[in-house]
């Protein structure tokens, strides 16, 4: 499937607030080249790439003199659009996945349906409003933008945790791992769209 039909895409998105370019290879090795100007966010996107095995290049110039919000949200939009473009008609994918992921004291559950129907259920509370200078509320904003633009139904629940960095990192890693599983080809139905409707485009 991957060899004859490369699942790769490039997206450029420019507004008055941000200028973003993204390339993805869904059948990669988890290589990343991330530069958003937001250090903690770069670290999280590296984790997303590494653990999903999606090769990802993200370059962003944003209005960081205001805050990080536009850059983080717009990266979610562009990455989501790139994933959707690379998936095409979503033929042959596994579609569903769920996972509990631990990091020290934190445990987070993620579940995904690559359905073509965008939706986010977010049950994550952070013990502090910031991780360094990064606003923790932006973690949700990123995943909201990602889900809406990738056309996926995504549930993320932090079951417990005390360290805000660990909670955020388990969210990114758990989502990465369920994307890795759900986007993988299903060897038993490589040429089929995994839906009784015959479409995964909404």
From Swiss-Prot:
Q: Which residues form a coiled coil?
A: none
Functional pathway: Amino-acid biosynthesis; L-histidine biosynthesis; L-histidine from 5-phospho-alpha-D-ribose 1-diphosphate: step 6/9
Q: Which UniProt keywords apply?
A: Amino-acid biosynthesis, Cytoplasm, Histidine biosynthesis, Lyase
- InterPro entries the record matches: IGPD_sf, ImidazoleglycerolP_deHydtase, ImidazoleglycerP_deHydtase_CS, Ribosomal_Su5_D2-typ_SF
Q: Which GO terms describe its cellular component?
A: cytoplasm
Tagged with keyword Cell membrane? no
Q: Fetch the Pfam families from UniProt.
A: IGPD
Which GO BP terms sit in this record?
A: L-histidine biosynthetic process
GO MF terms here are:
imidazoleglycerol-phosphate dehydratase activity
Q: What is its EC number?
A: 4.2.1.19
Q: Where are the transmembrane segments?
A: none
State the signal peptide span.
Answer: none
Instruction: Cite the PROSITE patterns for this sequence.
Output: IGP_DEHYDRATASE_1 (PS00954), IGP_DEHYDRATASE_2 (PS00955)
Which reactions fall under this protein's catalytic activity?
A: D-erythro-1-(imidazol-4-yl)glycerol 3-phosphate = 3-(imidazol-4-yl)-2-oxopropyl phosphate + H2O
Where in or outside the cell?
Answer: Cytoplasm
Protein family membership: Belongs to the imidazoleglycerol-phosphate dehydratase family.
Spell out the protein name for this chain: Imidazoleglycerol-phosphate dehydratase
| Encoding gene per record | hisB
């Amino acid at each position: 499937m991957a060899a004859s039909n490369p699942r790769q895409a490039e997206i450029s998105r420019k507004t008055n607030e941000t200028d973003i370019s993204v390339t993805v290879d869904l059948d990669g090795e988890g290589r990343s080249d991330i530069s958003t100007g937001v250090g903690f966010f770069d670290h999280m996107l590296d984790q997303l790439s590494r653990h999903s095995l999606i090769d990802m290049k993200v370059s962003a110039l944003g209005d960081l003199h205001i805050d990080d919000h536009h850059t983080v949200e717009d990266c979610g939009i562009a990455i989501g659009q790139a994933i959707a473009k690379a998936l095409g008609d979503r033929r042959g994918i596994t579609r569903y996945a769920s996972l509990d992921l631990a990091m020290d004291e934190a445990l987070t559950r993620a579940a995904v349906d690559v359905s073509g129907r965008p939706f986010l259920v977010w049950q994550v509370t952070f013990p502090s409003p910031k991780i360094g200078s990064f606003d923790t509320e932006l973690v949700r904003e990123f995943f909201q933008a990602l889900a809406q633009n990738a056309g996926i139904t995504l549930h993320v629940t932090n079951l417990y945790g005390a360290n805000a960095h660990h909670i955020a990192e388990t969210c990114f890693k758990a989502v990465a791992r369920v994307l890795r599983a759900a986007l993988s080809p299903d060897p038993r139905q490589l040429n089929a769209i995994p839906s009784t409707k015959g479409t995964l485009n909404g």
